[in-house]
């Protein structure tokens, strides 16, 4: 079992049950980087804070649902790339998650956003068509595995 550390900071009034996110981190990191240490920071914030982060890091003056940072991207890769440690930060705007949840519960939408953000943190992307298909496939796979118990 890989050592996975998930640190969650919630700056909002939203009452967060961290166990589903812990389970998701264990499954995704354990599957994508078996045996690699994973350190994941999650910040749950509001629109105002996200707008600042989005402006600071991406140059966009608006809120967004999630920002992900692969902090290990600059680390030297180990001989077995899958064993390279994972360091990522994920910022989630709970107000935006609420607005876009549609028929999902807030917890379900939060899980979907967390899965998306964590896959980015692991180096997956959806800019190029081939990458987009791979990331979408992985998102669907993990949603199917993890969403059964999320109400």
Spans of features found by a protein language model:
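An acidic/histidine-cluster motif and surrounding catalytic segment
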Residues: 1-111, 119-151
């Amino acid at each position: 079992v890989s050592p996975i550390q998930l640190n969650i900071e919630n700056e909002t009034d939203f009452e967060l049950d961290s166990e589903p996110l812990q389970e998701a981190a264990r499954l995704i990191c354990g599957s994508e980087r078996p045996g690699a240490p994973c350190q994941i920071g999650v910040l749950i914030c509001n629109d105002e804070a996200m707008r600042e982060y989005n402006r600071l890091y991406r140059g966009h003056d608006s809120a967004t649902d999630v920002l992900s940072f692969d902090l290990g991207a600059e680390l030297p890769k180990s001989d077995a790339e899958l064993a390279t440690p994972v360091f990522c930060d994920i910022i989630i705007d709970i107000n935006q998650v609420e607005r876009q949840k549609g028929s999902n519960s807030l917890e379900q939408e939060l899980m979907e956003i967390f899965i998306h953000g964590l896959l980015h943190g692991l180096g997956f992307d959806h800019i190029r068509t081939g990458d987009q298909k791979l990331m979408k496939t992985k998102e669907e796979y993990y949603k199917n595995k993890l969403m059964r118990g999320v109400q």
